[in-house]
Swiss-Prot record:
A motif (Nuclear export signal) lies at residues 55-70. It is found in: Nucleus; Cytoplasm. The keyword Magnesium does not apply. This is Nucleosome assembly protein 1;4. The gene is NAP1;4. The keyword Cytoplasm applies. GO terms for biological process: double-strand break repair via homologous recombination; nucleosome assembly. Its main location: nucleus. The lineage of its organism: Eukaryota, Viridiplantae, Streptophyta, Embryophyta, Tracheophyta. Residues 309-343 have a biased composition (Acidic residues). Pfam families: NAP. GO terms for molecular function: chromatin binding; histone binding.
Amino acid sequence: MSNSNKDHFDMSDLGASLPAAAAALSAEDRAGLVNALKNKLQNLAGQHSDILETLTPQVRKRVDVLRELQSQHDELESHFFEERAALEAKYQKLYEPLYTKRYEIVNGVVEVEGVNEAPMNQEEDKEAGNEKGVPNFWLTAMKTNEILAEEISERDEEALKYLKDIKWCKIDDRKGFKLEFFFDTNPFFTNSVLTKTYHMIDDDDPILEKAIGTKIDWCPGKCLTQKILKKKPKKGSKNAKPIIKTETCESFFNFFKPPQVPEDDDDDDIDEDAAEELQNLMEQDYDIGSTIRDKIIPHAVSWFTGEAAEGDEFEDIEDDDDDDDDDDDEDDEDEEDEDDEEEEKSKKKSSALKVE
């Protein structure tokens, strides 16, 4: 590879070097929110070339060798990503029969051996006669997870009781994934499957490009993402009918209507605060999707029983302990500084007394 090629900045590499929140606004069909960022990166590329130009020939030669080593490393890393993808695909196929069996047990398609032999009193026996599978399995599993619990409103719970299964798969371009939520017939919406698809810029270092959700076909008066407000007319008003207003409300089902980046024509209307808020919303949306994919689907029963939540709590405690240790170190340093100051003051006082 020649030095001129090395110094060239390729904008196609943009996605591989940005954090998820920022890159959420930097794919090719996204709006001009990213143009400023690209300009900054191009300026940085220019600075990179300037730095190389300032090096002495001897140092430049050493840096060139280091860059060759980096190229070798990147090639090995590329092979690693390929092998990892193949390994993940292999085990995903091995998981499928287990997920199918889980679906059958949860939804009462098959019965577990020994269930009818379990001792029960008469009341329990009557209830068990009408009870199939594991009621509210997915609702309970999701509510046990801290991230998802914040998204599920009390109104959502009735609808989520009809959730039969959640699956995920990679999409065709292998730069993203799709979540599928399978619902039993219910009084809230007519869709049997709700999907959420995440398109990524780079599969190896996930960077969100855009997200697309299913349009939910709500039954009349059952939309959970909106609430109807009735306002009484003013006294003496000719129109005696109450004013009816529809307002968007918090709901898990807003997950299927993800935040969208505005079109190019609307670029001038977006200020810095709005752009930052949009970034945060897209990052939060991706966190929810990846939590369902990486935690809920593979470990659903552990979330249902609460065991997985306990494991998460231990991780949080360890993180908090690390933060506390850092704070303690800072406190110790402050105390040492204070001791040094007191000692210095004492020395000055002693010197003053001797002079007198």
